[in-house]
Design a protein with these regions (language model features):
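Acidic two-metal-ion nuclease catalytic site recognized across multiple nuclease folds
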Residues: 3, 9-10, 170-187
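Structural motif
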Residues: 34-35, 121, 157-163
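ATPase catalytic-site recognition across NTP-hydrolyzing enzymes
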Residues: 1-32
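Active-site-proximal flexible loops/turns
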Residues: 33, 95, 169-172
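Mg2+-dependent endonuclease catalytic cores in nucleic-acid-processing enzymes, primarily RNase H-like
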Residues: 42-44, 49-155
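Short, flexible loop/turn motifs enriched in small residues
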Residues: 34-42
Length: 187
């Protein structure tokens, strides 16, 4: 779904303050264990400006639920006040409880919401993939860039898809906001 050459790496991003930004979290809660390869918790910060998506930051860790919660809280403090924070709401009561816990106890005072996913991971990644192919995704060059691109190129057959999931969630959320602002006239 992705090719390495589709990613445009940039050292600086234009007008970050003017961007609509979403930090989307894909949760996991398993600490790193020798001999195992558990999923990562990933928080992808994506901006949108003038028809282009900018991958501005990736927070990625393997940790206990307490370590994950602390990273999410610290990242919210680090991000701009206008960043919308989203998190995938897993099905069932546990998903509802997780979102409620974060809304009341961890991210109170921030723009936060849970997002129910629908469709397969590949379906949810289509907008991200298409935008990359068209040259409409810019990636800030950073220590996390190589791991991100490697994971994308291996998707959906790679051992991990957490960064793809988080970025897809952010891009889909930003796309939903853009669609709300468009006015359609039917003749």
């Amino acid at each position: 779904m992705f090719e390495e050459g589709w990613f445009d790496l940039v050292l600086e991003t234009p007008d970050v303050d003017k961007m609509k930004k979403v930090r989307f979290w894909d949760l996991a809660a398993t600490a790193e264990v020798k001999g195992k390869n558990p999923d990562y918790t990933v928080g992808a910060l994506v901006g949108f400006l003038e028809g282009r998506y900018y991958i501005l930051d990736i927070q990625r860790l393997r940790g206990t639920p307490g370590e994950v919660q602390l990273r999410i809280e610290m990242t919210a403090e680090m991000d701009d006040d206008g960043v919308q924070i989203c998190m995938e709401q897993e099905p069932g009561a546990s998903g509802v409880n997780t979102i409620d816990h974060y809304a009341r106890n961890v991210l109170a005072g921030y723009i936060f919401k849970g997002v129910k996913s629908s469709g397969s991971k590949q379906e949810r990644a289509r907008v991200f993939s298409s935008a990359c192919e068209m040259g409409n995704v810019k990636v800030r060059r950073d220590r996390w860039t190589k791991a991100l691109i490697d994971e994308c190129v291996q998707f959906p057959k790679g051992s991990h898809d957490d960064q793809v999931d988080a970025i897809s969630g952010a891009i889909n959320q930003l796309g939903a906001e853009v669609k709300k602002k468009k006015v359609r006239i039917i003749l």
